[in-house]
Design a protein with these regions (language model features):
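Flexible, glycine-rich phosphate/dinucleotide-binding loops
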Residues: 53, 73, 102, 139, ...
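Conserved beta-sheet core of the metallophosphoesterase superfamily
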Residues: 65, 87-157, 161
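N-terminal active-site segment of His-dependent metallophosphoesterases
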Residues: 1-64, 79, 144-146, 178-186
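Active-site metal-binding loops of divalent metal-dependent hydrolases
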Residues: 19-23, 48-50, 70-72, 98-100, ...
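A short, polar/proline- and glycine-enriched secondary-structure boundary/capping micro-motif
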Residues: 27-28, 104-108, 141-143, 168-177
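Extended active-site neighborhood of metal-dependent phosphoesterases/phosphodiesterases
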Residues: 56-72, 76-93, 111
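Charged phosphate-binding loop/patch that engages nucleotide di/tri-phosphates or the phosphate backbone
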Residues: 154-186
Length: 186
């Protein structure tokens, strides 16, 4: 395992999020190492394209949650889930590669993770935090520098940070309070 014991970190849980590695496993491994070493990420979400990259990350000892992307043969394999839906420290996280795969699971989620667009984005709609980490395809792709996200869940709030893959520098930060009950549409 590549993350430190929980007792050695501040209170709260740290999640790393990456997407659209498209075979760039050198950059993916470098970012995963930063997530673990610099930010103490306990779990890494890999949101597809390429699913085999995520498998490699898991085989390297990281705790990975993964979904296939649209370009992966695994996307068409009914045995492989296209959605992640899990609760961490009382916060429900839903993850997919493309928004079309959400199919209303976001209604029961506090955090929704998506990839596919290669554009990083942090947004709050109602009480739901939407996070797209960007891409790790190349240093620059479609005019966007490679990026990833780090999420910190603490008792009072959830904070997400988009970071540049090349330098780990902060590109964008957004927080949402946790002390308010979620408002869900029926």
């Amino acid at each position: 395992m590549h993350s430190p014991p929980r007792a050695l970190r501040d209170a709260g849980m740290i999640l790393g999020v990456m997407s659209d590695t498209h075979g760039n496993t050198d950059l993916m491994r470098s970012v995963a190492a930063s997530m673990a070493r610099l930010f103490s990420a306990e779990i890494i979400f890999h949101l597809g394209d390429d699913y085999r990259d995520a498998v490699e990350l898991s085989q390297a000892g990281y705790d990975v949650r993964m979904v296939p992307g649209l370009w992966c043969p695994e996307y068409h394999d009914a045995r492989i889930p296209r959605r992640i839906h899990e609760t961490f420290d009382g916060v429900t996280v839903a993850g997919v590669h493309a928004e079309k795969d959400l199919r209303h699971i976001e209604r029961a989620a506090d955090i929704v993770l998506t990839g596919h667009t290669h554009k990083p984005n942090l947004a709050i709609l109602g009480r739901t935090f939407y996070i797209n980490p960007g891409h790790l395809t190349a240093r620059i792709h479609r005019g966007q520098p490679a990026s990833y996200a780090v999420i910190k869940i603490v008792p009072g709030e959830i904070t997400a940070v988009i970071r540049e893959a090349a330098t780990d520098a902060i590109r964008e930060t957004l927080s949402i309070p946790r002390d308010l009950p979620p408002q869900r549409d029926n």
